């Protein structure tokens, strides 16, 4: 009985370790797919070290940032007064239909409807801190 219990614990630990490794690999794949999706955003936005505002604001440190507060970017009153603090749920709702989430936004983008693509894009964007470095 003791051997069976010990064996079960070892098997459980190995399963948990494999699951964690697969989860990390899946997240890396999601970020890579999100980077590809971000190509749709590059005409207006920048992210990463040295990113600057373009037609749209740079997106470093988006997770936890209040809407309308990227330095040196001229936001619409709608964005400045939206009361939004960016997080995963808010971003996903916004990116599906920006003008529905923030009526009056200057963002001229029809949105992304594919849930997997939205998830991947969030994984990519949210990995950058306010200085454009990838969080560890």
Swiss-Prot record:
It is found in: Periplasm. Binds 1 heme c group covalently per subunit. The N-terminus is blocked. Its main location: periplasm. One of its GO terms (molecular function) is electron transfer activity. Transmembrane segments: none annotated. It comes from the Bacteria. GO terms for cellular component: periplasmic space. Plays a role in bacteroid respiration under conditions of oxygen limitation. Required for electron-transfer during denitrification. This is Cytochrome c-550. It comes from Bradyrhizobium diazoefficiens (strain JCM 10833 / BCRC 13528 / IAM 13628 / NBRC 14792 / USDA 110). The gene is cycA.
């Amino acid at each position: 009985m003791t051997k069976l219990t010990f064996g079960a614990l070892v098997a459980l630990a190995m399963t948990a370790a494999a699951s964690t490794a697969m989860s990390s690999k899946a997240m890396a794949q999601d970020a890579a797919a999100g980077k590809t999706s971000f190509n749709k955003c590059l005409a207006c936005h920048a992210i990463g070290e040295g990113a600057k505002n373009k037609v749209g604001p740079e997106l470093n440190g988006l997770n936890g940032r209040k809407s309308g507060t990227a330095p040196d970017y001229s936001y619409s009153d709608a964005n400045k007064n939206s009361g939004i603090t960016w997080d995963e749920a808010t971003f996903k709702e916004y990116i599906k239909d920006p003008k529905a989430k923030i009526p009056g936004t200057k963002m001229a983008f029809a949105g992304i409807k594919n849930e997997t693509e939205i998830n991947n894009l969030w994984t990519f964007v949210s990995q950058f801190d306010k200085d454009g470095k990838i969080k560890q």
